């Protein structure tokens, strides 16, 4: 999406149906439940709708934010479009009439980078942010049900490194979420407890290199793109364990290595570090300038006092009578 192109593929048989141009660099996309539209969010804060049944038609503007959009999701019944931006806001709008805002989900303290609506529980929304939290919402009401701070799951509490959520993957069969964080690079496996309306930490998987994507397959296996290799994890006796030399893993890694020039620059592109806003401490700047003014006054007074002392020590010339 960096080259402002939207490519539409048919998977069976595999073929490219269309290549369309977006006005701005895209940040996220979602496909409607009816599979008739692609909703594309971009850096300027707009969402455009692209038809799937008419693969060559241009995009139509759906809605806009005042800030950069980072994530977009659609409710399974296609009633709502949910958008998240760099200014910590999650907006719930009507899909057919986007100017009608149903609710806001407010609570994050940094940019909102990921959104996910579990298909098994369409009334719920899970969001991830640069503040290192995963939050569970009843989005139609804009009410927060639970907040899980990922930094508390790290022994070092992430100290100077911020836990920015990069990816959020859902496993439909088990009500599990896999959360990939930017720094430190790790994957948190969370269980959705619908009755308790909570997200429960199940396991933390430490990444060997620098991971940049995560997903579940149809069999419940957890795939992690770790550096230049795909790694498969499967659950055994309640623990996620790496499965080495899996046949599918070998095939995927062969494709990655044969096309590595295409993938090589992507990990740096998808980093969340440039999304944090600069924190300008006006009080600290005021105090620094005040101290500079006081120091200048003291130096001026010292120099004036020294000049007066020199003048007082000089002998005075009296008048001489002839």
Q: For the regions a protein language model found, what residue spans apply to each?
A:
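Conserved strand-to-loop turn within each blade of WD40 beta-propeller repeats
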Residues: 1-3, 41-44, 83-87, 128-131, ...
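Short C-terminal beta-strands that terminate individual repeats in beta-propeller domains
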Residues: 17-21, 59-64, 101-107, 144-150, ...
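Conserved loop/turn motif of beta-propeller repeat scaffolds
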Residues: 3, 35, 78, 121-122, ...
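WD40-repeat beta-propellers
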Residues: 6-10, 48-51, 90-94, 134-137, ...
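Canonical WD40 repeat/beta-propeller blade segments in eukaryotic WD-repeat proteins
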Residues: 24-31, 67-74, 110-117, 154-171, ...
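WD40 beta-propeller repeat fold
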Residues: 1-56, 60-63, 207-208, 216-217, ...
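Terminal intrinsically disordered, low-complexity extensions flanking WD-repeat/beta-propeller proteins
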Residues: 144-322
């Amino acid at each position: 999406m960096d080259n402002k192109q939207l490519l539409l593929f048919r998977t069976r048989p595999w073929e490219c149906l269309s290549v369309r141009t977006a006005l701005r660099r895209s940040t996220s996309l979602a496909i409607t439940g009816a599979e008739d539209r692609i909703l594309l969010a971009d850096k300027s804060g707009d969402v455009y709708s692209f038809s799937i049944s008419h693969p060559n038609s241009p995009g139509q503007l759906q809605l806009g934010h005042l800030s950069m959009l980072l994530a977009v999701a659609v409710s399974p019944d296609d009633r709502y479009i949910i958008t998240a931006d760099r200014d910590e806001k999650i907006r719930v709008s009507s899909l057919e009439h986007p100017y009608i805002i149903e609710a806001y989900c407010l609570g994050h303290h940094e940019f909102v980078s990921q959104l996910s609506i579990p298909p098994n529980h369409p009334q719920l929304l899970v969001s991830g942010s640069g503040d290192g939290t995963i939050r569970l919402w009843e989005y139609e009401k804009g009410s927060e049900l639970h907040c899980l701070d990922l930094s508390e799951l790290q022994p070092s509490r992430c100290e100077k490194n911020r836990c920015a959520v990069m990816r959020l993957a859902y496993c439909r069969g088990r009500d599990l979420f896999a959360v990939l964080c930017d720094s430190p690079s790790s994957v948190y496996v969370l269980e959705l407890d619908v009755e308790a309306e909570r997200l429960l930490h199940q396991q933390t998987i430490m990444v060997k290199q620098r991971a940049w994507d995560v997903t579940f397959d149809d069999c419940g296996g957890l795939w992690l793109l770790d550096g230049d290799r795909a790694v498969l994890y499967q659950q055994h006796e309640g623990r996620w364990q790496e499965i080495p030399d899996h046949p599918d893993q070998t095939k995927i890694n062969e494709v990655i290595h044969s096309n590595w020039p295409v993938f090589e620059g992507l990990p740096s592109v998808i980093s969340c570090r440039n999304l944090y806003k600069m924190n300008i401490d006006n009080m600290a700047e005021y105090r620094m300038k005040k101290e500079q003014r006081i120091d200048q006054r003291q130096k001026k007074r010292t120099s004036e006092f020294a000049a007066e002392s020199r003048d007082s020590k000089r002998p005075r010339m009296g008048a001489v009578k002839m």
